[in-house]
Amino acid sequence: MPPLLTNRQAEELHKSMIAYLVASDLPDTAAALRREVNLSEDVFDPTTAKRYEGMLEKKWTSIARLQKKIMDLESRNATLQSELDNSTPASRLKRNQDPASWLPSTVRYSLESHRDKVNCVAFHPTFSSIASGSDDCTIKIWDWELGELERTLKGHTRAVRDVDYGGPRDNVLLASCSSDLSIKLWKPTDNYKNIRTLQGHDHIVSAVRFIPSRNLLVSASRDNDMRIWDVTTGYCVKTINGHTDWVRDVSISFDGRFLFSTGQDMTARLWDISTVSNIEHKRTMLGHENFIECCAFAPPTSYQFLAPLAGLGKRPSSTNGADFMATGSRDNTIKIWDSRGTCLMTLVGHDSWVQALVFHPGGKYLLSVSDDKTLRCWDLNQQGKCVKTLDAHESFVTSLRWAPGVAKNVPGGDGAAEGEGNDKNGAGSENPANIQMRCVVATGGWDQKLKIFAG
């Protein structure tokens, strides 16, 4: 049988034992052991003995503590296994098969590496990657399933304001925008190489969003304009004017035909962008009493809950893709609108600025985050009642995203829905019946943390 200890480990053990015997006033026993293990007195002198004194006792007590910890963990594991075994099959089935009613509650990971506040987050449409952008001028790529930092992207010279994944399925890109007035495109399949920098805005670029099914990207800026870019060439193909102050946020409809924008002019504006060369301003929504920070299109699954409020009947087989939308404002409220510009409901509950919104892919809920440090869940089937409030961060919450769904029965596994790269909601333009919902939500905050809530 091979020895359990290396020669060095055995020598250390022998010296510790001899030091223990000497300290215990057992010199004859110590001398006998020294002879047995061939340790001469000049090798194990009084100075060496002093150095090893107490080492055996420390190792012994450490082993005892570890043994107790192991026993405690084994007991806890047995308790949890018993609880799992005793849970009813029906309850397990409900947890596993009812993502439409899932709401975030438990933080799976609290990820830390940024050196300043986190401004934005975005899920990769296919892989378990998530990007976060910060005032520290960097973008960090994480594995949200493992809770591990994968890489840090450097290139911007000022705060990173927004990030978004999108583009063609076979060539997904990450877009980022910054207070340095630039937009950068990064290629995930090439170690996130910065393949292009888009210049044209005259002030802070506050938001970027890919348009589904097209090689186009929309950006919003403090220069009061929005721009549409061709990501294959890097050229600006259209500048959209209309807002009279800083454009804070943009959202793209699930079919890619409509753009929704909000700004410091306290307006929300709906645009038809189906023909880029002839963009049409459809509607201006008025009602907020302060700057509008964020916006989101409602997914098709929300139609059944919001249509009665708008006096509409059963959802037609084909809609304009922009039936309902939501806005969040510095007046602490959230408003739900229809495409006619009518405010259907105002959600009151936050105690400070509303910073980000996302609709539940199941359509029944709207989620929001705020400078009041909370994440709130609103039930659209109960007149927008707030049904859950979470203390999400230790300071202002800046950003919120829902992981995009994955298309079912797609060979090769490359079947993510086209949505996270298109809209904050993380759902695509495909038939919802063909999308498998993922119960994963991410938030970012002034506490420099990225948090992952997962079912």
UniProtKB/Swiss-Prot annotation:
Location of the region described as Disordered in the Swiss-Prot/TrEMBL record: 408-431
Biological process, per Gene Ontology: cell division; establishment of mitotic spindle orientation; microtubule sliding
Disulfide bonds: none
One family name in Pfam for this protein: WD40
Residues covered by the LisH domain: 9-41
Per-repeat ranges for WD: 113-154, 156-196, 200-239, 242-281, 287-347, 349-388, 392-438, 440-455
Location within or outside the cell: Cytoplasm, Cytoskeleton; Cytoplasm, Cytoskeleton, Spindle pole
GO CC list: cytoplasm; microtubule; microtubule associated complex; spindle pole
Functional description taken from the UniProt entry: Positively regulates the activity of the minus-end directed microtubule motor protein dynein. May enhance dynein-mediated microtubule sliding by targeting dynein to the microtubule plus end. Required for nuclear migration during vegetative growth as well as development. Required for retrograde early endosome (EE) transport from the hyphal tip. Required for localization of dynein to the mitotic spindle poles. Recruits additional proteins to the dynein complex at SPBs.
Domain description: Dimerization mediated by the LisH domain may be required to activate dynein.
Protein name in the entry: Nuclear distribution protein nudF
Source organism (scientific name): Aspergillus oryzae (strain ATCC 42149 / RIB 40)
Gene name per UniProt: nudF
